[in-house]
């Protein structure tokens, strides 16, 4: 009996040693170290879930492709998103963010119609509620209306379900009124993470960032149409996805000149459907 006990004791001790980390993390073993270890695990998981990629670019010169952060690009592309069209084609794409209506979208639509250019207009829930006639015109004239989320929250800060509902609810409202679903998504503030991309991909959306943008949304510090023309045209490049804010008077006034300058330089504007 004693010999059996001597044999069993090392086995029992070994099992306890192997089980110790599990017991510690689960809170079965009491003590300050165990509590600290458990808290650290929770904090790490929370930090991972709330990680944020904030889209930004270093502009290229003389037609060079802009550079974005390597990790941000990797996460974006791995998640099915994009920020460039075909960089082997001298074709660019116009996109407009519509957080609210500032009185210039009709003029922008007039110019696009006159120049025969199609664009993507990314709208929020507030824009949807207040601008029925303008959205109908966008659709009637062959433009694509993209999803910019219901409430313009920072998507990475939301739970999975809330993030999903921010996209789905606006899509549902849009479908009920206009009879079609949205195809493109642009995260508010250019903030995203792997979770956001996982959701958009699951919902059959294409997440479209941009390869050019400038500080055009500050409505109280517009710098004139000539400034807008030079700033945008200095950054033309193959496959460019251009982000302009429709609240900008400068953009509305300069849009025709921007399109004509692009064509003068040998560029053409692609259809939104090419980005799917």
Predicted regions and their residues:
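Intrinsically disordered, low-complexity segments enriched in polar/charged small residues
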Residues: 7-9, 29, 153, 191, ...
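Catalytic grooves of carbohydrate-active enzymes
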Residues: 237-273
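N-terminal pre-catalytic segment of deacetylase/amide-hydrolase enzymes
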Residues: 2-94, 101-109, 113-114, 258-261, ...
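Metal-dependent polysaccharide deacetylase catalytic core of the NodB/CE4 family, i.e.
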Residues: 53, 89-92, 102-109, 113-243, ...
